Amino acid sequence: MKVFYINPQSYNNLSTYDLSLLKNIQGHDVTYYHCDQYQHDILPGNSNKCYFHYNKKKYGITKGISYLCSIIRITIDAIIHKPDIVHVQWLRVWHIDYVFALLMHWMGIRLIFTAHNILPHVIKKNDKRHYKRYYKLVDNIIVHNSRTRKELAELMDISERKIKVIFHGVLNSDTAKADVISRADELRELLHIKPSDIVFSCLGVQKEYKGTSLVIDIWADNPELNANPNTHLLIVGRSHGIDYAPIIGFSNVYILDQMISDLDFDAYLHLSSAILLPYIRISQSGLLFSAVNQHIPVLVSDVGGLTEPLSYGNIGWNIGTPTKENLQRQMLELVRRPDEIEAIKNNSQEFDKVRKAYDWESIGEKTSSLYSGEY
């Protein structure tokens, strides 16, 4: 099958996802359309086309025009090369993406969409109606867990038969381990973190749906956390609408409100005792699978597929519903019993079980089977 694989957001964890998946798709002629922030080596055996440049544009209207031009170029390629399948990873501008999907449908091209989330993280007025139209138009939808499959079918009134469950794999870093350890040691010294200290971390872009405000409220209100010299909170990554004022004055809190390099991301992950993932809503988290790669325990809320990896290996704690009380209870338990963190962190067999369950080879095989119409 000739496949156009399109990801306009192929940067950071999303570019690692693409690389890991495409390396394991066999028996198909894949053309990979990505953005200019793709961070990995060009994939051998595939055609690679850097068509998306909207990230470099300063204003919204110029970003939109740039994105439209990219989609027009892909449409022209589709007319010329006649792919059997178009596989879209993310939607950026709904009206443009929907018209593109209509054109592919009219051309008789099979359309597959990976729903990394059912709806955007920040939901606007017409999003549900728009996404419902898109979901009904496409031929197949990939989701990352059975729970999301059921939720999507019910919310959008579509048959579960067109929704296929294909896991999100463990995200392997291509940064040299020695460099990560060296940078983590530098950060540890800079932040005055002792090897025996407990470090809770929120990494990546910070938004309300990730539960960052829950973490802030808990730290601000609890002296067992905010006045403890052996416990630290790191919040690293660009924020959108997060109020850090309640925790600014605490000496054991470090906030870095900016994008960071892959090396620094891996280093902050490495020096963390536990990653906080009290998401309010999500289907699956790339950060969770980055933590698995480095054997860093996670605290996850029971939403989407976040708890599913814990069923394959004891790699962290399920806090249940993402409430202040539930998250605080678990954080305090770990502060009082740090041996629990070390027991999980040092049990490589449990992390290996999760890695095996979310193996990219089997994910690639399943995706290849879907392309062939066998799944």
Task: State what each model feature region is.
Residues 7-69, 92-94, 148, 238-241:
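N-terminal strand-loop element at the rim of the active site
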Residues 193-210, 216-219, 233:
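Conserved donor-binding/catalytic core segment of Leloir-type glycosyltransferases
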